[in-house]
């Protein structure tokens, strides 16, 4: 039946666990890893994992929070990874961690703006994705070719995976992918599963979500309506 976390950690009234992370057993490797924090209000912070190496039984303050804000997710990442933030109203934003978020040296900070939210919206999840240097035209070409190959093999997922990413500059110029480049992109492809509060799901290729600078409104990840809910 397990053991109640309240018996392991001195949680205060109303305090909840937001993330549980699996760490390498060899703590000498921790210096190459970082922790990324995301809050409900759209802030994000990046710290070296070693900043949290020595934690006593009473815990440590992990992040400074404004009134009403809370941490929604914590993840292990490297500087060359992308972070994907998604909101309750179906927006998402993706950016390169090492370029867009400076490495904080302490824990007494609320971080920087990751995504700009509309009134009433909030961040509900964060995911870490492989960063792949691919032009808009290459990504469109890969998605089209991947969908064609799935249809040729009778893979029903071809109808839900492989849609073109939101139109952006250079995406309509076309690209000819060599077999080697197609294989390279395929090896780095990941999939994002977005599920609404009413149980509707959308499976999206990581190449459908373009990278941008942090702090913007992002793009539509999933349509929010009466059928789907948030």
Give residue ranges: language-model regions.
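C-terminal interaction appendages of subunits in large macromolecular complexes
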Residues: 1-230
